[in-house]
Amino acid sequence: YLSSILALRPDNGKLLWHYQTTPGETWDFTATQQITLATLELDGKPRKVLMQAPKNGFFYVLDRATGELLSAEKFGKVTWAEKIDLTTGRPVEAPGVRYEKEQVVMWPSSFGAHNWHSMSFNPQTGLMYIPYQEVPGVYRNEGAAFKKIDGLNTGTGFSDTHEIPREAVSGALLAWDPVCQREAWRVPHSFYWNGGTLSTAGNLVFQGTADGQLHAYSADKGQRLWSFAAQTGIVAAPISFSLDGEQYVAVMAGWGG
């Protein structure tokens, strides 16, 4: 069940179905990113679906009752696989991406095209708002005995961003149409590792950024409406609450892991 989505009965833990997003995972691509439930109109019929945009760069839509893979498309720059075969449900991998004989540069890196930072779905616009990041990685086989004294030891031998040119690294607020499986709009950011998103019924979407800004956008078109300087980076997702009839937005600031 490595890098898998599992459906379990809550009363007894019985496994109902599972879907593996990255079989034989060897790049630190996980399937622990947020899962969103919604009802989408697919082929003229309402379907109760499960949606996920994991680190591997593919946006998955599954029937949440049966685990049937309905669609899967790249939501950003992905070079480790050509596509997801909808018949087998498995990725069609690019040659050499398992770095068995020589190192490989590929997208995304272990930072992921989308990491733990929350995405949000707006039923009114029908869009998913993803904290997208574009960070390539250098993967190499350094052997089982290799250990980094001052770094992460994941067994992948993946690089950190010091090996990557600064101009190759970026982030964005990405509005994704899960029905058509395509980008609706995006707002580029100068850096990656930006905050999670919040979408509201008032046609608003909020996101904090690594450079310390909290932005409000129109949810349908991505027009920036206002910004607030938090004076420190933001990685958390904002929340909204009502007090004495007024709606407020709050976010925890402080840039980190």
Q: Each predicted region: which residue ranges?
A:
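Extended hydrophobic secondary-structure segments that form protein cores and membrane-embedded regions
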Residues: 50-53
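Long, low-complexity segments enriched in small/aliphatic residues
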Residues: 92, 102-105, 111-135
